[in-house]
């Protein structure tokens, strides 16, 4: 799962340098230990992953795999490097969105974006992995400062993911590859909406709302610095 890596990167670029560096070093150390203990399987796993499929799970196409790679596989008929590249792009997109929102003072919202990004970008993200929608929904309900379109889209996304209507679709035995356009839309809609929320968050950060929020945070930090000096 990409959650630790995405959260580490988010911490680093959001200004929490020490937390980000410690997390990244821990990741490298654990990965190195894995190679030392299981050199062959580790080499096979990462080598196959670079081609778009780790080979450890045959269910990438399954309807409840709500990841970018899952969507790519259902649309294209197979997991491939293109899906992996798209997943990396979404990871970068989500990281940018989270950092921008953090700098706008929306820390809880930013952390939820980072968590959801890790699920969208992971090769396998079963629908029950989406526990991030719980704090995400709470933040959206309580936070009146966020742009209304982000709150509405985010709450709808949380409800859609929680009820998971795509589970009503036929599944197993790669039947997902034969879905009609409407079935395909229902199955992939949550991922589309999740990516749209990431894009919408970046757009919001560059609107007057975002600029005002960053300016307010800068004044707040400067005020705290002056208070600390006195």
Where are these predicted regions, by residue range?
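Membrane-embedded alpha-helical segments of multi-pass membrane proteins
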Residues: 3, 24, 89, 132-136, ...
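Juxtamembrane membrane-interface segments at transmembrane alpha-helix termini
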Residues: 6, 32-41, 59, 123-127, ...
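Primarily membrane-embedded glycan-assembly and transfer machineries that use lipid-linked glycans
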Residues: 13-130, 178-187, 210-230
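Hydrophobic/aromatic-rich transmembrane helices and adjacent perimembrane loops
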Residues: 127-141
């Amino acid at each position: 799962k990409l959650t630790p890596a995405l959260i580490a990167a988010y911490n680093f670029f959001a200004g929490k340098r020490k937390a980000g560096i410690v997390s990244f070093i821990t990741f490298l150390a654990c990965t190195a230990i894995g190679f030392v203990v299981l050199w062959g399987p580790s080499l096979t796993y990462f080598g196959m992953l670079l081609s778009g499929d780790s080979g450890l799970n045959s269910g990438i196409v399954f309807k409840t795999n709500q990841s970018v790679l899952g969507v790519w596989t259902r649309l294209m008929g197979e997991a491939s490097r293109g899906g992996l590249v798209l997943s990396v792009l979404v990871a970068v997109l989500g990281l940018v969105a989270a950092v921008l929102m953090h700098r706008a003072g929306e820390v809880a919202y930013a952390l939820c974006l980072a968590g959801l990004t890790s699920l969208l970008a992971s090769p396998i993200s079963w629908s029950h992995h989406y526990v991030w929608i719980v704090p995400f929904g709470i933040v959206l309900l309580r936070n009146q400062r966020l742009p209304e379109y982000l709150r509405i889209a985010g709450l709808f996304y949380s409800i859609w993911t929680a009820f998971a209507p795509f589970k009503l679709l036929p599944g197993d035995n790669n039947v997902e590859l034969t879905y009609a356009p409407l079935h395909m839309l229902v199955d992939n809609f949550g991922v589309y909406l999740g990516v749209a929320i990431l894009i919408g968050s970046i757009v919001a950060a560059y609107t007057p709302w975002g600029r005002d929020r960053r300016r307010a945070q800068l004044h707040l930090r400067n005020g705290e610095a002056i208070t600390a000096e006195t």
